């Protein structure tokens, strides 16, 4: 079935006043209603991001066409179709040299969402990359993907074990997917892809900590060349002291690895990334992880980054204490003794406790041939109303001297979510990330959820 636009006239006046989305909406058609719904709900938001970020008009058309013809067909059922996760995310990276728009998404063919053909999304991810790699204007090198996939993807035997009803039905969404993709939409040059592996299922079925799975995969890729190992070594040393455990949906740890990612470009330019979640929101804890217990104190840019992180901590009015998944609160209420809850038992401390499904996120970026890993911190924003979160982002931009971005940010946000009262909503601005490199200075990203809300 082909779905055609219905009565979408150009704005009053000259046709030249139509935005790229409005012009394309007159001629695009889609194979089913789900695809049409993705276009109508997410297309205008992407169009506004590109427009308000002052992308070249040709790039605006290119990226909207790319989204409509190549991303939407691999998103699966339309938005609001019973997802217990957010299958599409728009993010905007800000730095001194300007801003860049990026899309993050989970490739899910419709059949894989309603049948057991591809329960962990591995086939959908590979099919999506094969499709996107054929697009003119996309740079794609699958060597990094295949090297990591050979170590991190579930084997057929592991998949079968995870699909046992008593196991699979109790898993959270993070345990039921193996991969996500992201595409960067640069102002010049080619579109590039990045792939993510969520390793909770692999860890659970192999009874191996995610940290160990990740470190071993990176060492196997390095294959004795010492391109990745020097930067990996301080990470291994720091987390070896914590005695990391295999992932468990009912007994999460306070500090827990979750994800591995890499760019799907030539190996010499690929950034390999390790992501972890931290439940204790304290600045001293943040600083300890950011510096790997002091191992990075002499690395370029670390001191400057820490200074700005302290400013961000204050600007965001971080609610300090332990932040747990709501599942843990349920376990604690049902438990009659600490042992039956395992790691879900309350920590023996006087810190405040929140059961709000939020965590600080860190990633450590490893580039071939570089001595030091590059840390980045991700701050959840859902504890703030979107209006207050926007005020915090504006305050950060002003602190960084980005006056024009600060002036425009809140008005732009209202344009992305025209039907929302930002004083009453939360989580539309889902996460704010920050890193610092001496050559490029501060680098921050805002991640937007509930696209088209």
Curated annotation (Swiss-Prot):
InterPro entries in UniProt: Aro_prenylTrfase (IPR033964), Aro_prenylTrfase_DMATS (IPR017795), DMATS-type_fun (IPR012148)
Entry EC no(s): 2.5.1.107
UniProt keyword terms in alphabetical order: Alkaloid metabolism, Prenyltransferase, Transferase, Virulence
GO molecular function: prenyltransferase activity
Pfam families the record matches: Trp_DMAT
Pathway(s): Mycotoxin biosynthesis
Residues flagged as site, Required for regioselectivity: 104
NCBIfam families, sorted: arom_pren_DMATS
Protein name, entry field: Verruculogen prenyltransferase
Species classification: Eukaryota, Fungi, Dikarya, Ascomycota, Pezizomycotina
